[in-house]
């Protein structure tokens, strides 16, 4: 297995000679089949890396903070790896970042 050091946020390993990605430093193995590889050091401020998290649709956010604990989430996958908000933080989907729960913009009705 050949190893390469890449400056990417994620690596889409399509073949041994074709890679796609964004910012962040990772070590990627060139594998024989396509797959997406996320690594811990690509997480942003107030995020932590999780090898196995619920579907991203189930992440606590400013949009669902009031009903998050009372309404079950329908997961699209049983387990995915990636960055999640640290405890006490929720995803602000407008900006895509994790902010303190009490910093969520208030919705006016």
From Swiss-Prot:
<keyword id="KW-0964">Secreted</keyword>
<feature type="disulfide bond">
    <location>
        <begin position="62"/>
        <end position="104"/>
    </location>
</feature>
<keyword id="KW-0722">Serine protease inhibitor</keyword>
<keyword id="KW-1199">Hemostasis impairing toxin</keyword>
<protein>
    <recommendedName>
        <fullName>Serine protease inhibitor</fullName>
    </recommendedName>
</protein>
<keyword id="KW-1015">Disulfide bond</keyword>
<keyword id="KW-0646">Protease inhibitor</keyword>
<keyword id="KW-0295">Fungicide</keyword>
<keyword id="KW-0044">Antibiotic</keyword>
<keyword id="KW-0732">Signal</keyword>
<feature type="signal peptide">
    <location>
        <begin position="1"/>
        <end position="28"/>
    </location>
</feature>
<feature type="domain" description="TIL">
    <location>
        <begin position="43"/>
        <end position="104"/>
    </location>
</feature>
<feature type="disulfide bond">
    <location>
        <begin position="58"/>
        <end position="73"/>
    </location>
</feature>
<feature type="disulfide bond">
    <location>
        <begin position="43"/>
        <end position="83"/>
    </location>
</feature>
<feature type="site" description="Reactive bond">
    <location>
        <begin position="77"/>
        <end position="78"/>
    </location>
</feature>
<feature type="disulfide bond">
    <location>
        <begin position="52"/>
        <end position="79"/>
    </location>
</feature>
<comment type="function">
    <text>Dual role peptide that functions as a broad-spectrum antimicrobial peptide and antifibrinolytic toxin. Inhibits trypsin (IC(50)=375 nM), plasmin (IC(50)=2140 nM), and microbial serine proteases (subtilisin A (IC(50)=294 nM) and proteinase K (IC(50)=459 nM)). Exhibits antifibrinolytic activity by binding and inhibiting plasmin. Does not inhibit chymotrypsin, elastase or thrombin.</text>
</comment>
<comment type="similarity">
    <text>Belongs to the serine protease inhibitor-like (TIL domain-containing) family.</text>
</comment>
<feature type="disulfide bond">
    <location>
        <begin position="85"/>
        <end position="98"/>
    </location>
</feature>
<keyword id="KW-0800">Toxin</keyword>
<keyword id="KW-0929">Antimicrobial</keyword>
């Amino acid at each position: 297995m050949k190893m390469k050091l890449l400056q990417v946020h994620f690596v889409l390993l399509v073949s041994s000679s074709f890679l796609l990605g964004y910012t962040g430093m990772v070590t990627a193995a060139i594998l024989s089949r396509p797959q997406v590889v996320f690594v811990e050091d690509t997480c942003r401020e107030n995020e932590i890396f999780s090898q196995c998290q619920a579907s991203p649709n189930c992440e606590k956010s400013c949009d669902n903070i009031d009903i998050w604990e009372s309404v079950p989430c329908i997961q699209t996958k049983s387990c995915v790896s990636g960055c999640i908000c640290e405890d006490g933080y929720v995803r602000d989907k407008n900006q895509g970042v994790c902010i303190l729960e009490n910093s969520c913009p208030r919705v006016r009705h």
